[in-house]
Amino acid sequence: MSGPRPVVLSGPSGAGKSTLLKRLLQEHSGIFGFSVSHTTRNPRPGEENGKDYYFVTREVMQRDIAAGDFIEHAEFSGNLYGTSKVAVQAVQAMNRICVLDVDLQGVRNIKATDLRPIYISVQPPSLHVLEQRLRQRNTETEESLVKRLAAAQADMESSKEPGLFDVVIINDSLDQAYAELKEALSEEIKKAQRTGA
């Protein structure tokens, strides 16, 4: 795939990835583009098909995975999630820096491709803070909350693995985390601005 170097943003649910990503895309709308992932889960209130996710059936997604149409895919809480090659190519075709929001399994899958992105992990300051954030969302059942927290603990440990991420941001303060994210991407932003992304 050609075009500007992509960015892989990862971290546990509730760490603030989506909030940071929305802010980045708003401030740099002509520079970054969001790779819209596919999922077999049901939409949450306010989510739009084709904007937040492509909501598809398990059968359709399994067929496309088998056909090699996905850069990465993973299963969480009985639902499939994945990034299609077409979604990344669509952003790159606009000469924008493609941002992929993926889980840890997705990061490992992408490492095995020729994509060569910048890997950034967004982590909560603690598991306790993360639990508070997830409870405030009020979108999880107790069972799914327990699963998310277990996955988050593994994610937080893996973020310390040498060489897995280029940058790890601890999101204790949204403004500070956003400043760190922009700093981590400053060279790519400058390159994209010079080439008229």
From Swiss-Prot:
Write out the function statement from the record: Catalyzes the phosphorylation of GMP to GDP. Essential enzyme for recycling GMP and indirectly, cyclic GMP (cGMP). Involved in the cGMP metabolism in photoreceptors. It may also have a role in the survival and growth progression of some tumors. In addition to its physiological role, GUK1 is essential for converting prodrugs used for the treatment of cancers and viral infections into their pharmacologically active metabolites, most notably acyclovir, ganciclovir, and 6-thioguanine and its closely related analog 6-mercaptopurine.
What tissues express this gene product? Widely expressed.
Q: Which of this chain's residues are annotated to bind substrate? A: 37-51
- Phenotype upon changing L25P: Leads to aggregation. Increases in kcat with GMP as substrate
Task: Tell me what disease the record lists for it.
Answer: Mitochondrial DNA depletion syndrome 21: An autosomal recessive mitochondrial disorder characterized by ptosis, ophthalmoparesis, myopathic proximal limb weakness, variable hepatopathy, and altered T-lymphocyte profiles. Multiple mtDNA deletions and depletion are detected in muscle, as well as mitochondrial respiratory chain deficiencies.
Organism expressing this protein natively: Homo sapiens
| Every Guanylate kinase-like domain range | 4-186
Could you say what the effect of mutating S186Y is? Increases in kcat with GMP as substrate
Q: Which GO terms describe its biological process?
A: dATP metabolic process; dGDP biosynthetic process; dGMP metabolic process; GDP biosynthetic process; GDP-mannose metabolic process; glycoprotein transport; nucleobase-containing small molecule interconversion; purine nucleotide metabolic process
Summarize the subunit comment. Answer: Monomer. Interacts with RD3.
Where does this protein have coiled-coil stretches?
none
Q: Which GO terms describe its molecular function?
A: ATP binding; guanylate kinase activity
Protein name (record): Guanylate kinase
Q: How is its activity regulated?
A: Up-regulated by RD3.
Where in the cell? Photoreceptor inner segment; Cytoplasm, Cytosol
Residues modified to N-acetylserine: S2
- What enzyme category does the UniProt record give? transferase
> What InterPro entries would the database entry show?
GK/Ca_channel_bsu, Guanylate_kin-like_dom, Guanylate_kinase, Guanylate_kinase_CS, P-loop_NTPase
UniProt xrefs under NCBIfam families: guanyl_kin (TIGR03263)
Active site (record annotation): R44, R137, R148
Q: Which Gene3D superfamilies match?
A: P-loop containing nucleotide triphosphate hydrolases (3.40.50.300)
Q: Which family does it belong to?
A: Belongs to the guanylate kinase family.
Q: Carries keyword Kinase?
A: yes
Reactions catalysed according to its record: GMP + ATP = GDP + ADP
What EC number(s) are associated with this protein in UniProt?
A: 2.7.4.8
Q: What is the effect of changing G11R?
A: In MTDPS21; uncertain significance
Which residues are listed for ATP binding in this entry?
Answer: G14, A15, G16, K17, S18, T19, R137, N171, D172
Q: Which gene encodes it?
A: GUK1
